[in-house]
């Protein structure tokens, strides 16, 4: 092994790595977290998972890409390098931010716990996220509006084109075109 290291261009970095404190972590995609809404979300379950990792002495949580998946629902098959998966948005977080009320979620479908039923999830959660977006835009006193406007201005290099693409895609019934 030393002979291999001596011939390696970044020999010093490799030697430092071999002497460094070992660390460990877990690979788990956010969608695999437990939760009542059919898919793992970036919310309280994610925070609890991080706390549990720390309690177990784990230093890293590796996740798969969180971009918006294309038709096969794979995190590696995305339609944007920048847009995130809207189904990872925490519904409880939207309730906390007063963009939804608990009753907006009713009726919550009976989701399977071992596999994600993407059709059922998308049909249900899309309408709820649309309601949250409408509530956000119609709110008289909106404390999140500055953050939203800042996000839009910082991401204008891709956001408008992506929004246009998604509208056209929806108008085409999500068919692929070239």
Indicate residue ranges for each PLM-predicted region.
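Acidic/aromatic-lined carbohydrate-recognition and catalytic surfaces
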Residues: 2-14, 18-178
């Amino acid at each position: 092994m030393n002979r291999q290291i001596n011939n390696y261009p970044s020999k010093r970095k490799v030697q430092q790595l071999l002497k460094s404190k070992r660390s460990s972590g877990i690979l788990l995609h956010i969608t695999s977290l437990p939760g009542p809404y059919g898919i793992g979300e970036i919310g309280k379950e994610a925070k609890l998972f991080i706390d549990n990792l720390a309690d177990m002495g784990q230093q890293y949580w590796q996740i798969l890409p969180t971009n918006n998946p294309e038709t096969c629902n794979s995190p590696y098959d995305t339609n944007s390098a920048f847009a995130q998966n809207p189904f990872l948005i925490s519904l409880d977080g939207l309730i906390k931010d007063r963009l939804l009320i608990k009753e907006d979620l009713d009726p919550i479908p009976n989701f399977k716990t071992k596999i994600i039923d993407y059709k059922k999830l998308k049909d249900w959660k899309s309408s709820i996220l649309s309601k949250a977006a409408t509530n956000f835009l119609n709110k008289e006193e909106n404390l999140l509006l500055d953050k939203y406007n800042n996000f839009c201005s910082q991401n204008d290099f891709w956001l408008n084109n992506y929004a246009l693409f998604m509208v056209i895609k929806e108008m085409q019934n999500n068919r692929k075109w070239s």
